[in-house]
Amino acid sequence: MFGLDPTLLFLLFFCLFAACAFEFVNGFHDTANAVATVIYTHSLKPTQAVVWSGFMNFLGLLTGGVGVTMSIIGLLPTELLIDSNVYHSMAMALSLLISAILWNLGTWYLGIPASSSHTLIGSIIGIGVGHALLPENSNKGISAINWDKAIEIGQALLLSPLFGFALAIILMYILKKTVQNKAIFKEPKKNTPPPLWIRAILVTTCTLVSFFHGRNDGQKGIGLVMVILIAFLPGYFAVNTNLDLVEVKTSLIQVRQIVAKIDTVPLSEKEVESYHKVLKAGDELDTILVDGLTTAKLSVDQKFQIRKAALTINKNAKKLIESESVALSATDLNALKRATAGKKAPFFSFGASSSSGIAGITDFAPAWVMWLVALSLGLGTMV
């Protein structure tokens, strides 16, 4: 099956099972965050709260697109995602899964409120550091890790609790000053639900926390599964085989035309390097696509070349877009963003999801992957 020998096929299914187990553990590990208040205040019965939370996690993941998914995959060094040696990729996938699952299970068993997101991101960065320290990668070292993306995600993880803490204090202060009925600030009586309006607020917040947990944390599971599929079956999942290559070529032409307008004189050394990388990768991608080949006819090596070129273009084009030294009109900057990162995804994108522009080559997830992870997360939440 899939051209894999029995051992690799077994390991593929084992890794997929482990990824589902991670999402399952993620579900029952994080359920308390959403349902604690509605159960404690008797707004909902425990079974009602847990089932409702599970359903909203499931729905949130299915409608969330792949934005967070690609941020997770983007943490890995590009070389790891285009390694044609399946055993290297297998070691990466197993290391990631085993470390994340063991920590999640351990913290759940000991009752430690640890974050699944921190666990997964830490595992991915650990893999990147381990890969960078291998003798054959000594020339690049830890610079091969996507530190820009790691810092971006790290800032979000650090700011999230601070934002929640500050906003909770402000809202509590406003309620204390404006609500006349002080009974709502006292400990709830046994088996007595709160006033209807308080109950409605608590159920609404439980619903929204569960829904957005699925949209955010659930997508990390999709990223995990996609890393496994790219590692074991690059011929099927290294690039999006359903993408319209005419659209890709149109986006590529736009990128090359706009980047060619940039005056390199005021740019720093690193920005000039990014400039040349975009143009070189654009030439490589155009060479592969010039004959109008469909991805179904391309070899695995060619798909890896397409993936590498697309990742290189997007990564370095983003640096140029964000640079203050790049003198481009607002129209050109917006066109470059659309041609590389694609249009902003709709809030609801049910089922299979992918980006547009050149990002659409690598930023995608099949419908069955989203359903698999959504079911794992939803069922785990109900445990």
List each model region and its residues.
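Residue-level signal for short hydrophobic patches within transmembrane helices
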Residues: F10, F14-V25, W52-F55, T204-R215, ...
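Transmembrane alpha-helical segments of multi-pass membrane transport proteins and ion-pumping complexes
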Residues: L16, C20-T31, N57-M70, L96, ...
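Cytoplasmic-side transmembrane-helix entry/capping segments in multi-pass membrane proteins
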Residues: A114-G122
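Glycine-rich, mobile lid/loop segments that gate access to catalytic sites or pores
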Residues: P113, I125, V129, G141-N216, ...
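Membrane-interface alpha-helices at helix entry/exit sites of multi-pass transporters
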Residues: H42-G54
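Interfacial segments of multi-pass membrane proteins
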Residues: T37-K45, I121-L134, V225-L233
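Helix-loop-helix hairpins and the membrane-proximal interhelical loops
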Residues: M1-C15, M70-A91, Q180-N191, I228, ...
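Low-complexity, proline/glycine-enriched hydrophobic segments characteristic of transmembrane helices
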Residues: P234-W368
